[in-house]
């Protein structure tokens, strides 16, 4: 083919330009998926002022404040200043709670191993009489719900309650002494209620944590240990011998929120350094810095919801069903309902 023939307009028609090759369409981006609605969000709302004050009076074992003065007075302002001093001082904080127990780190590491031997764990547990009793008690509770009529020894108890049950039994035994107090002081009078509430929060926290994608045991520990803030707060107040305070002054509607914020700060300052697990350390720092009402982490949300539900449980009149006392009860997940109902029946 000559160049002349190619270009001569009378001897060859110009062919229409070929259509450009189609450009491959970019793969369609999936539409953003909205986060699933939290079915337990109804219990995430703050307690009313009346509920909050009633719960404070229950857990701290002080009388209701129907005849409280309009102003809490300068003594309370001085109290807050002293509490802030304690919160900011590692030396002063160290006097409020026993040091974090380190007697069982090897056992805890063993329990995190999927291939742990129940016999090996039983041998370790058998060295502690109190822990042995707690493990067998937990297994007996499981046994009573089943049809097995065999005898429960320690090795069998370890197998029956499983890893999560063991961790909880160990946590209860090791951490319970932190909440104990004696004498006629604010902390001593409140000790039983603080522990009862901590146990409720721990059990609820384990269930709620799993629904927020968090290890249930981290939820259990966070719920159990959050109340160390109450214990530390009241022990600090007990130690202020130069400040004369009544329960009515502590339970004043303007004082309770200030005390609760300092409870959270003490929880963060005391529990954070214990290095129990990364999620627990992080939630302790978050609660300590922001307060329980402002947390955003998954474990923080589980802890806050557990705290709300535990408060409803404490405030429920005898004989009242959960549907009457818990907001939007029917919307809660079945596992949360079951856990709450079990606590209410105890």
Positions of the model-derived regions?
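Conserved alpha-helical "signature site"
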Residues: 2-225, 230-239, 250-346
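Catalytic or ion-translocation cores adjacent to nucleophile or general acid/base/metal-coordination motifs
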Residues: 243-245
């Amino acid at each position: 083919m000559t160049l002349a023939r190619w270009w001569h307009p009378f001897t060859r028609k110009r062919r229409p330009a070929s259509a450009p090759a189609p450009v491959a369409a970019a793969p369609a981006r999936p539409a953003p998926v909205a986060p699933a609605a939290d079915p337990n969000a109804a219990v995430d709302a703050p307690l009313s002022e009346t509920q909050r004050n009633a719960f404070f009076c229950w857990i701290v074992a002080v009388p209701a404040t129907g005849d409280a003065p309009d102003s809490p007075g300068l003594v309370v302002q001085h109290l807050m200043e002293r509490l802030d001093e304690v919160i900011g001082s590692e030396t002063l904080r160290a006097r409020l709670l026993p040091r974090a127990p380190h007697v069982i780190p090897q056992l805890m590491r063993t329990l995190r191993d999927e291939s742990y031997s129940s016999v090996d764990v039983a041998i370790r547990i058998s060295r502690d009489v109190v822990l042995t009793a707690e493990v067998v008690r937990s297994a007996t509770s499981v046994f009573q719900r089943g049809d097995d009529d065999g005898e429960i020894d320690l090795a069998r108890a370890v197998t029956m309650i499983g890893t999560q049950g063991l961790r909880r039994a160990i946590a209860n035994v090791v951490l319970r002494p932190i909440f104990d107090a004696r004498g006629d002081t604010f902390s001593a009078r409140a000790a039983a209620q603080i522990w009862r509430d901590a146990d409720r929060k721990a059990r609820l926290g384990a269930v709620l944590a799993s629904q927020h994608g968090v290890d249930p045991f981290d939820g259990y520990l966070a719920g159990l240990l959050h109340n160390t803030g109450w214990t530390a707060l009241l022990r600090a107040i007990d130690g202020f011998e130069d400040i004369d305070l009544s329960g009515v002054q502590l339970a004043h509607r303007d004082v309770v929120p200030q005390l609760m914020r300092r409870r959270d700060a003490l929880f963060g300052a005391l529990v954070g350094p214990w290095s129990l697990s990364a999620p627990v350390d992080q939630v302790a720092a978050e609660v300590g810095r922001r307060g329980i009402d402002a947390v955003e982490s998954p474990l923080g949300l589980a802890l806050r919801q557990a705290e709300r539900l535990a408060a409803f449980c404490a405030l429920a009149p005898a004989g009242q069903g959960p549907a009457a006392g818990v907001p939007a009860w029917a919307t809660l997940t079945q596992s949360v309902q079951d856990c709450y109902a079990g606590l209410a029946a105890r």
